[in-house]
């Protein structure tokens, strides 16, 4: 009996060549709607679906393959005598290949002007049903949902006259990944449309971007996946202009650097090591901002990741060229800057649209046996809600330094303390188990520069000991959430030393 293939695709990439290859192997091809029209326009002889079902395509194509003559031909177990007898009695012929991909639901809902009705109309019903039927019966049916697999199937047919069992299994697994991702997109769209923030089940889907050499350490395997609708201002959508392939740690660090530099509207440069900022500088131009970020910690910046929110010019590139860096991220690079930086063959250069998120996306964190979901911390300082409990208010320069430190501290691992002075960070204390420990690290790093600087704390001071350390170092202004039962103790210490202190009412823990 002649083998048969059913071909009905939304993505018509390579389908004409593939069907031509099937026909050359003596395989009969059944097709529907626009796919049939395309194949016939290219001189290929195919059978219309209505000839198989004995029933016309109806309801604007909503019902065309949902028929026993199709699904019987897909689901029949060929070595089951009962199935074969029933097929013969009912005139059902087997279908050996299914070539189907689904209505472009993702592309439809990505359109800015999409209506709910348009989205619903692009939910495929017949396609998923067919490929699931074929995948379930993959011992007898080869099912292809990805044009990437066309050449593999044709090569095996030409060499062996059939598709290998292992290949059929791989193709079947891809089908169920394909339909699961498709249904997840639909589920998420409808959930968002209904305004449900915490549904009883969470479905997520990500698309493979690249395999990585290894994970956080060489003994760990890793892969990079991107969200279907990730913001273009993300590492997932970065364009790499030069350098080695990104590593797992590179991606994490680049993401951290990008998150911080997005906080600034003025020219800014951020240097990151191990997902913590080691230097942040702002200025009237990007060269000045980089100089300050470098001077913030010229030791730790070595081997770091740099993110800038303005084009990298030649002068800045020449400064960057002087030290070893893993990555430089910017919205763009001048041609002269590229010529300078591309002389370092391993330096990775990424262009990314630097744009602060206007709404909080969801952050997913895996834990053993589960997943935590929360909104990203995109909250900026609201000066209308702050309070100043101390006798002295910050000066104009102190306010500038406090705001810079506050923008940075929320991106530092808790317990976090950041010192800033003259448009740059001068000390960062990260990840200590007690707040005063982080303060001591930041103060030690700042050295003499701590005199007259501003301090930001990601959470309140449970005791006045951090204030005491700040006062000894000559720090003159502090910004913190407030809210401790011992706030009065901290206020008294601040007033004793003439420190201006701001309460934001907002905590910025980061773990």
Curated annotation (Swiss-Prot):
Q: Answer yes or no on keyword Transferase.
A: yes
Q: Name one GO biological process term.
A: 'de novo' IMP biosynthetic process
Q: Could you tell me which PROSITE patterns the record lists for this protein?
A: MGS (PS51855)
Q: GO MF annotations for this entry?
A: IMP cyclohydrolase activity; phosphoribosylaminoimidazolecarboxamide formyltransferase activity
Domain named MGS-like: residues: 1-145
What CDD domains does the record tag this protein with? IMPCH
SUPFAM superfamilies, alphabetized: Cytidine deaminase-like, Methylglyoxal synthase-like
**Which Gene Ontology CC terms are recorded?**
cytosol
Show the Pfam families listed in the entry.
AICARFT_IMPCHas, MGS
> Which EC number(s) does the record attach to this protein?
2.1.2.3, 3.5.4.10
| Pathway it works in | Purine metabolism; IMP biosynthesis via de novo pathway; 5-formamido-1-(5-phospho-D-ribosyl)imidazole-4-carboxamide from 5-amino-1-(5-phospho-D-ribosyl)imidazole-4-carboxamide (10-formyl THF route): step 1/1; Purine metabolism; IMP biosynthesis via de novo pathway; IMP from 5-formamido-1-(5-phospho-D-ribosyl)imidazole-4-carboxamide: step 1/1
Q: Can you state which reaction this protein catalyses?
A: (6R)-10-formyltetrahydrofolate + 5-amino-1-(5-phospho-beta-D-ribosyl)imidazole-4-carboxamide = 5-formamido-1-(5-phospho-D-ribosyl)imidazole-4-carboxamide + (6S)-5,6,7,8-tetrahydrofolate; IMP + H2O = 5-formamido-1-(5-phospho-D-ribosyl)imidazole-4-carboxamide
Q: Which UniProt keywords apply?
A: Hydrolase, Multifunctional enzyme, Purine biosynthesis, Transferase
Which InterPro entries does the UniProt entry name for this protein? AICAR_Tfase_dup_dom_sf, Cytidine_deaminase-like, MGS-like_dom, MGS-like_dom_sf, PurH-like
Family assignment from sequence similarity: Belongs to the PurH family.
- Comment on protein domains: The IMP cyclohydrolase activity resides in the N-terminal region.
For this protein, the record's HAMAP family field holds: PurH
Q: This protein is called what?
A: Bifunctional purine biosynthesis protein PurH
